[in-house]
Amino acid sequence: MSDIPSDLHYTAEHEWIRRSGDDTVRVGITDYAQSALGDVVFVQLPVIGTAVTAGETFGEVESTKSVSDLYAPISGKVSEVNSDLDGTPQLVNSDPYGAGWLLDIQVDSSDVAALESALTTLLDAEAYRGTLTE
């Protein structure tokens, strides 16, 4: 069974979300997603400062099996990207919830309540696990 940490939020598209600051979240793909993809060979991420919209694509993960779109779990601005993935994209496979993170998204600091609201619309670990068995 895939590793599904209970302290994260999830999307049905297999992204995980961790609150990393008052107005910032860190985003990655789940253990299930990296396992289904196989060996990751390239990750395309937006540049810092790019606006992303919840539910819309922000990049791609390319593996030896396929290319998969990445979807923003919340709307905001890219505040950081994991530049380590440029040289070692396989971090997504070896440590999807740690060193293999993708990017940080920052919401408007004057609207932190919107971040709280957005997080409540995401799946918790139990609900995400349920999507994998359907």
Curated annotation (Swiss-Prot):
One BP annotation, GO: glycine decarboxylation via glycine cleavage system
The keyword Acetylation belongs to this UniProt entry's keyword annotation: yes
Per the record, residues carrying N-acetylserine are 2
InterPro entries named among the record's database cross-references: 2-oxoA_DH_lipoyl-BS, Biotin_lipoyl, GCV_H, GCV_H/Fam206, GCV_H_sub, Single_hybrid_motif
Enumerate the PROSITE patterns for this protein: BIOTINYL_LIPOYL, LIPOYL
Give the record's cofactor note, including how many are bound: Binds 1 lipoyl cofactor covalently.
Q: Which GO terms describe its cellular component?
A: cytosol; glycine cleavage complex
- Residues that bear N6-lipoyllysine: 65
Q: Look up keyword Isomerase and say if it applies.
A: no
**Lipoyl-binding domain: which residues?**
24-106
The role this protein plays is: The glycine cleavage system catalyzes the degradation of glycine. The H protein shuttles the methylamine group of glycine from the P protein to the T protein.
Q: Which family does it belong to?
A: Belongs to the GcvH family.
Q: Read off the NCBIfam families from this record.
A: gcvH, PRK01202.1
Listed HAMAP family: GcvH
Q: What is this protein called?
A: Glycine cleavage system H protein
